Every structure is written in C-alpha cells, then in structure tokens.
Amino acid sequence: MKFIDEFRDKEIAQGLIQGIRKTTTRPVQLMEVCGTHTVSIFRYGIRDMLPEQIRLLSGPGCPVCVTPNTDIDFAIALSRQEKVIIATFGDMMRVPGSTSSLQNEKAEGRDIRIINSSLEALRIAEEHPEKKVVFLAIGFETTSPTIAVAILRAREERMKNLFFLNSQKRVPPVLATLLQSKELGIDGFILPGHVSTIIGTRPYQFIPREFARPGVITGFEPLDILQGIWMLARQIAENRASVEIQYRRVVREEGNPVAMEKIYEVFKDGEGHWRGMGSIPDSGYGFREPYREMDARNFDVEVEPSKEHPLCLCGEVLQGIRTPPECRLFKVVCHPENPVGPCMVSVEGTCHTYYKFQ
C-alpha cells in the first residue's frame, strides 16, 4: 500500500538496526510516552530487534489509564443524580473505580452514553434541554482542541445544560517528573507523534536544557520507530542532547498554533492528577473565568472516598517502574474480559498490550 509499505521496508529496517547496534556502546534506557508507540513496538517485534544494551520502558502514554480513581468515582456519583446524562468515550466505560464502573452503573439504569467526539455532547444537550449533560473530558493535548471548540460553541449557543468533567492532561510536565525519578534513570525519550502535532517542539526544550537528555518526536510505523531510536542512540553516543523530529511528514516545530490558541482561549495550565503519580503542577488544565460555569466539579455531589485495588500495579506500570508480568494479577484474574485496573482496559494500556502481544 503506497505511503505505508515504504515505512515497513525490511532492507531499510536492517540498515537502521545495524546502525543502532554500532552506535550503542553502553546500557541505555529509552522511554516511549505514547500508547500507540507501545502497541507498534510490540506488534512489530521491535524490542527483539534491538541490541541487549537498549531497554525500552513504557511510560504514561494512555489517557484512560492515567485518569485517577477520584475522577472515575466523581463521574459515577454524577451518573447517580436525577436528570443527569453522562457522555463519555467508550474506553472509560469499563475502567474500574473504587467500587463500581460506568458500565456497571449503566446496567443499573443510569443514563450513560458512548460518544466518539466531544461535539456529540452538544447534540445530546440540545435534544434534552430538561437534563444536565456531563461530558467526561479526558485526553492529552491531541484531544484538547476539540474539547475547547465544543465549550466555545456551547457558550456561543448559550447552552445552560452542558458541563465538562475536566480530566485532561499535559504531557511535558509529567516528563519532568519521570526524569527526576531515581528509580528509572531515563537516557532519552521517544516523544509522542500525535501530541507533538499540536504542541510542536518548544514545550520539550526543558528536557535537554535542564536534564541534558535527548528526545526524538517519532512516528508510528516500524521504520519511524527504528529511526527514532537510532537518532537517540547517536545523540547519546555523541554526548549531545536536543529535541529532534523524526516524524517530519506530520510534525512541525511550531506545532499547530490555531489548535493551541483554541485550547488557551478556554483553559489555562493547572494542576493535574495522575494515577500512581499524584498531583503534578501545570500538568492539567483549569477553566478560564468565562467558562467556569461549565465545570462539572461545581456540582454538589457526595463522592465516596477513593481507593485502589491493593494488588494492582497499574500506577507503577505507568511510570515504567514495573512491567505487567511483575503484577500478581496479570493474566490470572486481570485480563481484557475482567480488567482489574485501567492499564488492562484501554487498547493503548501497557497491560493490555503485553497481554495481546507477549
């Protein structure tokens, strides 16, 4: 298939692998922070192609997975209110909260609807003016522009019954947290392609400047990933640190200024809460003043104290501290048909990927 086969050429792959082997002379730990990268790395067997000195870590690249139980529990509490409709992306349905899930609540008769776009929430609100519609706004910078546009349109149309439970995350601040970890020892990042189409290279510049580590924005085909790893290996071998773009056919240094303008018209950087990592400054978004009336956290609801499954290692898996096979629940009681933690729910979750491909 044109424009696909070119990025799966075996001869070129062999050349890149040889280049990586020649360049890598010491143990190196690289982390990918995109669930799509994790899936591609496993699907194409890229770990098995690399020299033993290179270890790939899977980081917090799954937006469903990093959403903490506190937000899941809040959404469940909202769903139990009278005349409330919850609108959510499909993956969120099966994510276990402290004692229930949205899927279980729907089975109990709560009005919970799966949508594919935040703009669909506007349609639901228009069709049900007598009810309060709450959209579960999760995702990284990739989905934030469309969420912002939905909010702008709702305000423009003076909708009073549409609200947003904001659990969006910003990627760059969590990278700083990971680099500060003494357990990980990250030598470089395979930076996310989709997120970078929005934010560009500038938000990553602290990585080489403050931590002297390289990062390469990388695509998702086998040759993309191998070339990204080779570019990182060269920087490490040459004792350099900069942010480079491998995925140049899609990503520009400036990102998408129009999309960023929409995001910051509605939101400002704020505290973000991550599963397993707690609160990270500026890793989330807060509503700007004109749009705070749409914040679903203004609802007066009683939420049960949140708790985690005592044996689930999802929080540590998201940080690259543990791998799924180290979890006692993995493949025993935790599997895609019965996920104990969110890392097994989403197709971008590390546990789901290990289960499917390893």
Label each residue range with its predicted role.
Residues 85, 132-134, 188:
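Structural motif
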Residues 227-316:
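Internal helical hairpin/lid segments
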